[in-house]
Amino acid sequence: MFTGFSQETSEFMMNLALNNDRPWFERHREIYERSLKKPMDELAKEVMAEMVRRFPDDPFELHISRIYRDARRLFGRGPYKEELWFSMKPSRSMEGGGTLFFGIDALSWQVGCDFWRDP
């Protein structure tokens, strides 16, 4: 059950931004798992369950971001993302359906809806 993000979450994210390397991350992996990954997974699954309950005829796809950056796109940045997010969209097609999202970083959180349609 999602109980919220903590001060430890913000502190971990801030420290990750300042120490974005594998040795630091491995030393702090337990904090990541406890204060960021687990709450994000719980929140995403609870929001998804509510969407399924409210819209039983419209299956949704849930995507939870990974902490690891794509190694092909580092461009001088560290190997870990400095934000974590999840999104969900109707699985029938992108056309006409919105994507809901939530994201968190060291200083803020974002929530919203995005609509995309071919021109």
Task: Cite the ranges covered by each PLM segment.
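Short, low-complexity N-terminal intrinsically disordered segments enriched in polar/charged residues
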Residues: 1-7
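Active-site acidic/histidine clusters and adjacent loop/turn architecture
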Residues: 14-67
